[in-house]
Amino acid sequence: MNRLPSSASALACSAHALNLIEKRTLDHEEMKALNREVIEYFKEHVNPGFLEYRKSVTAGGDYGAVEWQAGGLNTLVDTQGQEFIDCLGGFGIFNVGHRNPVVVSAVQNQLAKQPLHSQELLDPLRAMLAKTLAALTPGKLKYSFFCNSGTESVEAALKLAKAYQSPRGKFTFIATSGVFHGKSLGALSATAKSTFRKPFMPLLPGFRHVPFGNIEAMRTALNECKKTGDDVAAVILEPIQGEGGVILPPPGYLTAVRKLCDEFGALMILDEVQTGMGRTGKMFACEHENVQPDILCLAKALGGGVMPIGATIATEEVFSVLFDNPFLHTTTFGGNPLACAAALATINVLLEQNLPAQAEQKGDMLLDGFRQLAREYPDLVQEARGKGMLMAIEFVDNEIGYNFASEMFRQRVLVAGTLNNAKTIRIEPPLTLTIEQCELVIKAARKALAAMRVSVEEA
């Protein structure tokens, strides 16, 4: 039987939520009630599958750990009052930490004036952010399209490349194996994981995948496309594959891809949604090889962990296809004043505090510690790898990876797996993580591995 809508129920639920939002703290009974409510509502109204995922990466299969608030700049607090060092970083959102005061202040100040733009008048912060990104990004990148997420930024990049290359008779895209570019129809066509692709087949035509890091495979694909008349519009790739398991290409790979794109007249799209904004020790990962893309995709950390925002930045030559009709690709909330305020403040913090350099220093410290643990526990750990504050620990099998996440949860350190590689746990903390917290994370990882070895020996 169809359920009738209930205004009274909706009003009561929204009022209850607003009451919780107003509260800074909860007593013990309120915490227990909130946990029960959240679990029930996820099961009945969000997606019960998320409960099982959360259960797999928390201590003892307890999915009752409900996030309540940020603790310090680099920590989270649940409804039980337990504080966790955040080594997940919202999958790369919190580069400048949780509730960074500079970012929060900028958003609050803008909120007091104008939260959203009229859609008709010129909005100043969008212009200022576009100018800032033109100055910050490498090469001839000049014009920015703003959206709300990484997937949207990739979608815009693909459409922009199509609009530019279609008059030239170039319609094919080359992506790489193991890559993750998002889950909208266009972005999913570039994504390489069958689990996400199969339910939505057929996807957009014209996408090919080649092994990541293999420059000869890239050259072969470009040559084959040219011979068959399927000329390549663009090559799209991540400088370091995040969801693929923090996979680093061989040195010089990006430079070689750039040369091939120039040789075959293909655009180079770099998806820096996860690697950008200082994460790898440079503001953008492509700067490690001084590579200049034609189109650059940003999101995640661009909003400072306070507002969602994505950006697609392109050269004037490429972006000019939108000049005659700027409404060819738009979004209602993209580039709104609150999001732009957050992004401008985030960039300011990254530069003022030199956080990319800090990411390199602290990332080296963490990675040295994880590699030492890999040497101490070769029966459990296959490899520790990474660049800057984007790291991964790969285990010998999937189950060990899940157990490690649970043990780290017991040690009050939050980590999680990657979408495309179940054996790999990603370490992606805020760039603001302190040296003392870095040391605590390494100690927690050592305790977790020691406990896991005992469990294996007793089994």
UniProtKB/Swiss-Prot annotation:
PROSITE patterns the record matches: AA_TRANSFER_CLASS_3
Keyword Transferase listed: yes
Organism of derivation: Shigella flexneri
Protein name per Swiss-Prot or TrEMBL: Putrescine aminotransferase
Pathway: Amine and polyamine degradation; putrescine degradation; 4-aminobutanal from putrescine (transaminase route): step 1/1
Family note: Belongs to the class-III pyridoxal-phosphate-dependent aminotransferase family. Putrescine aminotransferase subfamily.
Binding site for pyridoxal 5'-phosphate: G150, T151, Q274, T332
EC numbers, comma separated: 2.6.1.82, 2.6.1.29
Biological process terms in GO annotation: L-lysine catabolic process; putrescine catabolic process
Modification type N6-(pyridoxal phosphate)lysine: residues: K300
Protein's UniProt keywords contain Plastid: no
GO molecular function: diamine transaminase activity; identical protein binding; putrescine--2-oxoglutarate transaminase activity; pyridoxal phosphate binding
Gene3D superfamilies, per the entry: Aspartate Aminotransferase, domain 1, Type I PLP-dependent aspartate aminotransferase-like (Major domain)
Pfam families: Aminotran_3 (PF00202)
PANTHER family according to UniProt: AMINOTRANSFERASE CLASS III, PUTRESCINE AMINOTRANSFERASE
UniProtKB keywords: Aminotransferase, Pyridoxal phosphate, Transferase
Class in the EC hierarchy, top level: transferase
Xref: InterPro entries: Aminotrans_3, Aminotrans_3_PPA_site, Class-III_PLP-dep_AT, Putrescine_aminotransferase, PyrdxlP-dep_Trfase, PyrdxlP-dep_Trfase_major, PyrdxlP-dep_Trfase_small
Domain of life of the source: Bacteria
Function: Catalyzes the aminotransferase reaction from putrescine to 2-oxoglutarate, leading to glutamate and 4-aminobutanal, which spontaneously cyclizes to form 1-pyrroline. This is the first step in one of two pathways for putrescine degradation, where putrescine is converted into 4-aminobutanoate (gamma-aminobutyrate or GABA) via 4-aminobutanal. Also functions as a cadaverine transaminase in a a L-lysine degradation pathway to succinate that proceeds via cadaverine, glutarate and L-2-hydroxyglutarate.
Reaction(s) the record says it catalyses: an alkane-alpha,omega-diamine + 2-oxoglutarate = an omega-aminoaldehyde + L-glutamate; putrescine + 2-oxoglutarate = 1-pyrroline + L-glutamate + H2O; cadaverine + 2-oxoglutarate = 5-aminopentanal + L-glutamate
